[in-house]
Amino acid sequence: MLRLSLLRSTATLPVKCQRRGLILPAAAMYTLGSLIFGKEARLADAMERGELHNKNVDYAKEAEERTELRIRALANTRSMEPRYNGHVPLHRYEKLLLFAISGWNSFFHPEDGYNIVQLGEATALPVFLENLKQTMLSDSSGRRILKEQPNITTEILHMDKLAKLPHNTFGYVYYQWLKRENVSPDTRAPVKFIDDPMHAYIFKRYRQCHDFYHAITNMPIIIEGEITIKALEGANLGVPMAILGGILAPLRLKKVQRKRLYNIYLPWAVRTGLSCKPLINVYWEEMLEKDVTALRKELKITLPPDLRTMRKERAALRKEIDAKYNSQKRATTPA
């Protein structure tokens, strides 16, 4: 038996060696062919681009120029040349697509601010922005804002200074609101899809002032608070997206939330928006040291019921009712 096993092992040995002898030369030929033909292919490409036999040509510069030509060719497919930093010109059909997609996403995913940003610009029609421009031109503060074009950032507002202001000032109220809601004026998205530079700035100004509206009305950034402020903006400024939000956004809320909005906050927002001064004309940066109560009176803004308090009271009431129900259920359940 031992002899038979040795014979079998020695019989298979040449076959394995033969296979290994075939595989190794094939692998070597493949590697050598790749080097030769790959090099020839690269040489052919370089010859086609004219990068051989001329040591005086800056090939890196030529490659950069070719890239620039491709970018220009792509830019020529746009509806116009960009008119300001960050401008993305769109054709009409692209604007319609932007409106449809952002509108759909905003309705089903309102928690994603990017959808709201896109919908805002998609619905910011030139006629609306021109009307807002005329509103600003008719007011001395509005004209100054258009002329100076301030940019609202934490650096400009000096947040450390706001934290030390008297507690009755609007600046301190604004600072505390930012801190409580954990937001910053630096997080506002830039305007990209509005073509006219002045219109783009006006919409940027509207967007950057949004948090001031929250702070002066003591409205949180939860969904009910956002809908309320959008309704205020729609009534006061005629912002199309804000009007749409005030009408459609409540449809996806819980019954108790819709009831609060329809009975309390939306009527307040519409009434206040129609009666107060155009908020786009307020130079908020210059109002930070004013008494907040006096500023509200000057702007004809009345405070709504505290939304945070109402939500807490309802949560406490629901917790109390649940506790009573569970207690009664345990009492009536036989041991």
Swiss-Prot record:
Zn(2+) binds at H210, D211, H214, E226. It is an enzyme of class 4 (lyase). Residues 1-10 form a transit peptide. Its cofactor is Zn(2+). Coiled coil: none annotated. Its EC number is 4.1.1.130. It catalyses: 4-hydroxy-3-methoxy-5-(all-trans-hexaprenyl)benzoate + H(+) = 2-methoxy-6-(all-trans-hexaprenyl)phenol + CO2. It is a peripheral membrane protein. It comes from the Eukaryota. Lyase that catalyzes the C1-decarboxylation of 4-hydroxy-3-methoxy-5-(all-trans-hexaprenyl)benzoic acid into 2-methoxy-6-(all-trans-hexaprenyl)phenol during ubiquinone biosynthesis. Belongs to the COQ4 family. This is Ubiquinone biosynthesis protein COQ4, mitochondrial. It comes from Saccharomyces cerevisiae (strain YJM789). The gene is COQ4.
